[in-house]
Amino acid sequence: MTTVLIAPLRRAGVLAKQAATIDALSGGRLTLGLGVGAREDDFQFAPASFHDRGRRFEEQLDLMKRVWSGQPVSDEIGPVGPPPAQAGGPELLIGGYTPVSIQRVGRWGDGFISWGVRDPEQVRRLFDLAEESWRTEGREGKPRLVASLYYALGPNADRGGDYIRHYYSYFGPGADDMARSIPSTQEALDNLIRGLGDVGADEVICWPTVAELDQVDLLAELVG
């Protein structure tokens, strides 16, 4: 699972072929999380246009769906392989935290993935928007709902805040708020994971913010 890959930084045709190849090699186990991105410096470096990234993302989704379903790409270009193992392409999760980004779930996605969870009630509102977009497009069933969170456990848990402040420095004071809110005890992390389950998360992805392997062991002790 990619959580999430910033599609507007990339060429849609190449990305579609790469994803289809990985899906075929893995026997259909690829879940592709995609979003538009929020860091303008990423786009300056690429380089790629930043302010029209939402429109370009939707054009990319249209193209990738055509490629994966075996349709001609254009009047001049026929179907392009390799075919993915999953019919219609890999499972596609749309990431984001604004209503506009979440509205794309119903039209193009198989589900929604939230980002950097701190408050289950906030995630509930995002999940509700994803389900609303699903119904608006007249789709059956429900979207897959995935939550992701940061955590730091053990004697060096305070380093987790340093990582968040550095990575999200472009948020300004918001980076400090994020750093202070990451769970740093097993009780706090357990409460957050349970809270996300209560608001409808089908899966919770936990990202350690301390670069030590024992973070995985400490998480395993908690979740069993």
Regions flagged by a language model, labelled:
Residues 1-224:
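Active-site-adjacent structural elements that line small-molecule/cofactor binding pockets in enzymes
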